[in-house]
């Protein structure tokens, strides 16, 4: 993170002409288990990772917000918080920031303008929530600069609202919540209905290894929407608000009445919720053998029932599983049809995993992977006052 801090300080001073007063960060995240459960009111188990979005900031006495994006060649966006805050067609990055500020104002928070320089190293397009980290770090920045009485959960909800209503992207609450509330060496069990969270301790030395298949993700939106509709149809047949409310026993009694495809989709969600709650218990007990079994079951369910994995992802999972055996776990993470796998790997095996993947993945698929070796880290907060 030190390089990011240096970059935002330097760009702040160069472009805005004076020194910032605060450095704030918010992390990306990876979901360890609980896939496609969020929009079914279920459970997820993400952790924050040591890839962050960092801000250098200072408050202004007037109503102007000026933002410098280091990652877009020090491009600048500027808006007045007393005027209508509008969507910028030609500066997509700026809309996340505008949306967060607009939503904070709509929620009744009072503040003046600010100068902000922002940079991040959360890999974009890998499904590690670079957009949520940006939304949360901006909310955190206004909290810190103006001593706003806003909880971390509300910073997360505000970020989600900005993405849904201002940016126009329909996301669940997981990404923002873990970025805002993460804890070092802990995962977070999140109930996507009540928004209750529970910290789950992880074995301290355990590496969180994320491997991007670099398989271009096609069909994601249309397939995602289809899955969502199938889940809603299943909930309707069971007469419940969401699949969260169906037990596996109830499912088995009624499975004959369901369309075969809808039954497979529902079975994934219902069993995945049970797995996620049990995974939190296994992780807390540092029972990596059980955690690994649950992650393997999750992957098989995504592959066979939810049908969102692809050959490249299945290949990666098999390669990693060979190396870690029952000392850790591995599965696809994220929306599917490409993207990343996540593995919990004992530190002694990290180099083996990297070497084996390098030796086998490209040979099998023609694609070169990207590997990120992470630790579970703290959520958003003040890094330093200058």
UniProtKB/Swiss-Prot annotation:
Q: Which GO terms describe its biological process?
A: galactose metabolic process
- The source's superkingdom equals Bacteria
Give the binding site residues for Mg(2+). 131, 163
Q: Name one GO molecular function term.
A: ATP binding
Kindly list the GO CC terms recorded for this protein.
cytosol
Cytoplasm listed as a keyword: yes
What NCBIfam families does the entry give?
gal_kin (TIGR00131), PRK05101.1 (NF003472), PRK05322.1 (NF003705)
Q: Where does substrate bind?
A: 35-38, 224
Family listed: Belongs to the GHMP kinase family. GalK subfamily.
Instruction: Note the PANTHER family from the entry.
Output: GALACTOKINASE-RELATED, MEVALONATE KINASE/GALACTOKINASE
What this protein is called in its record is Galactokinase
Metabolic or biological pathway, per its Swiss-Prot or TrEMBL entry? Carbohydrate metabolism; galactose metabolism
Taxonomy of the source species: Bacteria, Pseudomonadati, Pseudomonadota, Gammaproteobacteria, Vibrionales
Report the Gene3D superfamilies cross-referenced here. 3.30.230.10, GHMP kinase, C-terminal domain
Q: Which PROSITE patterns match?
A: GALACTOKINASE (PS00106), GHMP_KINASES_ATP (PS00627)
Q: Which SUPFAM superfamilies match?
A: GHMP Kinase, C-terminal domain, Ribosomal protein S5 domain 2-like
Pfam families in alphabetical order:
GalKase_gal_bdg, GHMP_kinases_C, GHMP_kinases_N
């Amino acid at each position: 993170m030190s390089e990011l801090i240096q970059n935002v300080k330097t760009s702040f001073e160069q472009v805005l002409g004076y020194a910032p007063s605060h450095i704030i960060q918010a992390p990306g995240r990876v979901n360890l288990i609980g896939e496609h459960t969020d929009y079914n009111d279920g459970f997820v188990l993400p952790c924050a990772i040591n890839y962050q979005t960092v801000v250098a900031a200072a408050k202004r006495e007037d109503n102007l917000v000026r933002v410098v994006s280091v990652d877009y060649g020090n491009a600048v966006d500027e808006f007045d918080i007393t005027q209508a805050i509008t969507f910028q067609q030609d500066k997509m990055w700026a809309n996340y920031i505008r949306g967060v500020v607009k939503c904070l104002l709509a929620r009744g928070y009072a503040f003046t303008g600010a100068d902000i320089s922002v940079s991040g190293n959360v890999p974009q397009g890998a499904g590690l929530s670079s957009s949520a980290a940006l939304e949360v770090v901006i909310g955190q920045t206004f909290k810190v600069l103006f001593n706003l009485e806003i909880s971390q959960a509300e910073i997360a909800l505000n970020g989600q609202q900005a993405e849904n209503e201002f940016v126009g992207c329909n996301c669940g609450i997981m990404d923002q919540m873990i970025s805002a509330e993460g804890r070092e060496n802990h995962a977070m069990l999140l109930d996507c209905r009540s928004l209750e969270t529970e910290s789950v301790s992880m074995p301290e030395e355990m590496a969180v290894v994320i491997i991007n298949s670099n398989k271009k993700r096609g069909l994601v939106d249309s397939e995602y929407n289809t899955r969502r509709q199938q889940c809603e149809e299943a909930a309707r047949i069971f007469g419940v608000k969401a699949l969260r409310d169906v037990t596996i026993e109830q499912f088995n009694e009624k499975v004959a009445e369901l369309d075969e495809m809808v039954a497979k989709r529902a079975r994934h969600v219902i069993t995945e919720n049970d797995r996620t709650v049990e995974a939190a218990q296994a992780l807390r007990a540092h029972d990596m053998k059980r955690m690994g079994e649950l992650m393997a079951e999750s992957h098989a369910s995504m592959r066979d029932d939810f049908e969102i994995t692809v050959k490249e992802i299945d290949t990666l999972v098999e390669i990693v599983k060979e190396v870690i055996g029952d000392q850790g776990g591995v599965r696809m993470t994220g929306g599917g049809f490409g993207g990343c796998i996540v593995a919990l790997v004992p530190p002694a095996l990290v180099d083996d995993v990297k070497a084996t993947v390098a030796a086998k993945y490209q040979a099998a698929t023609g694609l070169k992977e990207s590997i990120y070796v992470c630790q579970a880290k703290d959520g958003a907060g003040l890094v330093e006052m200058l």
